[in-house]
Amino acid sequence: MLVITRKKGESLLIGDDIEVTVVKLDDGSVKLAIDAPKKLTILRKELYNEVQEENKKATNFNPSILKNIKSK
């Protein structure tokens, strides 16, 4: 893991097309601005983990419950 110290207004580059800038520093939190291609999905880790968990739940579908549905 790379650890970098940045001040407000300073940036770091990831590859050729991603720039992360420190926008604001508060008590115990940092606001970051991320400039990246629109095709790239950027999620907070806790949201990513939540999406992964929902995807796992969706794959546990039991097709036998469809037998109770009447067709028109």
Curated annotation (Swiss-Prot):
GO terms for cellular component: cytosol. A translational regulator that binds mRNA to regulate translation initiation and/or mRNA stability. Usually binds in the 5'-UTR at or near the Shine-Dalgarno sequence preventing ribosome-binding, thus repressing translation. Its main target seems to be the major flagellin gene, while its function is anatagonized by FliW. It is found in: Cytoplasm. Pfam families: CsrA. GO terms for biological process: bacterial-type flagellum organization; mRNA catabolic process; negative regulation of translational initiation; regulation of bacterial-type flagellum assembly; regulation of carbohydrate metabolic process. Keywords: Bacterial flagellum biogenesis, Cytoplasm, Repressor, RNA-binding, Translation regulation. Homodimer; the beta-strands of each monomer intercalate to form a hydrophobic core, while the alpha-helices form wings that extend away from the core. Its main location: cytoplasm. This is Translational regulator CsrA. The gene is csrA. The keyword Plastid does not apply. The lineage of its organism: Bacteria, Bacillati, Bacillota, Clostridia, Eubacteriales. InterPro entries: CsrA, CsrA_sf. SUPFAM superfamilies: CsrA-like (SSF117130). HAMAP family: CsrA. GO terms for molecular function: mRNA 5'-UTR binding. The keyword Repressor applies. Belongs to the CsrA/RsmA family.
